[in-house]
Structure formats: structure tokens, C-alpha cells
Curated annotation (Swiss-Prot):
It is found in: Secreted. InterPro entries: Mss4-like_sf, Mss4/transl-control_tumour, TCTP, Translation_control_tumour_CS, Translational_control_tumour_p. Belongs to the TCTP family. It comes from the Eukaryota. It holds the Pfam family TCTP. Residues 1-172 form the TCTP domain. This is Translationally-controlled tumor protein homolog. It comes from Crotalus adamanteus (Eastern diamondback rattlesnake). Venom protein that causes edema, enhances vascular permeability and is likely related to the inflammatory activity of the venom.
Amino acid sequence: MIIYRDCISQDEMFSDIYKITEVANGLCLEVEGKMVSRKEGEIDDALIGGNASAEGPEGDGTEATVITGVDIVMNHHLQETSFTKESYKKYIKDYMKSIKARLEETKPERVKPFMTGAAEQVKHILGNFKNYQFFVGENMNPDGMVGLLDFREDGVTPYMIFFKDGLEMEKC
């Protein structure tokens, strides 16, 4: 499995269990999720590869709290945050500077394509600003990456957008 981490906060943003597509000429990764419902405190056996206990039926007849949300957000403990258009412009300007500095050190050949593509992508984001929900990593680092959540035209299928150059891949 590959875990994609925010290169600034080191927070886990998503993994390769989802359908991942490069968009915006390879500048961003679009990660498709789905809406799920879970009992609070319950861990999906599919995520850990485990089996239900053979010791007998679970539960003691109490009602469980059911939480419904996007699997990417729930599985990776992403935290919702909010922005006005102006506050997002300020955030994204500072974030782009951080990524540019990182690229200058690690991948200088990516600086120009990143800066050109990022300007276009930010225009697109601002043009569709009202459609997005914003999520940061578990540690809620204000300098870290903000993932954008939107829904496909069907209104049911959620997807998130992340800047590819702001991510590190870690094999587990």
C-alpha cells in the first residue's frame, strides 16, 4: 500500500486504495471516494484485513451512533476547515511559496511547470469556490495542504483534489 502524506505537516492525506487520477496536466491528483456509514468506534474489517470475532455475536443491545461521511475523510482523519475566498487566496499564495521552495531544493525541473499550472488551477478553484469543502490533515497544521472535496455531477460520488507536488509517497 502507498500512503500519500502532506510534505509540510507529514499528515496522512489518502492512500492508494482509492481510484487516483492525475488532473490539470499532472499538477493535481483527483481521489475518488464514496459515502459510507459507520458505527462510532467501529473499524471496518476490510481496512485491516481482519475477520469478525469467532467468539460469538458482538454488541450488548445498546444503540450505536452511526456516522456518515466520505471514506477518504474518515479513514485518514482529515479535519474540515473553512475559508472565505479572501482567506483562501492568502493561504494558497503562502502554500505555493512553500511548495516552490521545496521543489527548488528537491526537483528544480518541476518549479516552472508547477508555478504555471498552479496559477491556472487556483483560478479554476476560485471560480468554483462555493462547490468545495476544505480539509486539512489530522494535526490541523495551518501551513499544510488543504484537500478540496467536491461531488461529481451525479451529486453522490465524492472526490478530493490534492496538489501532487505537495505530497510524499510512502510504501507500507
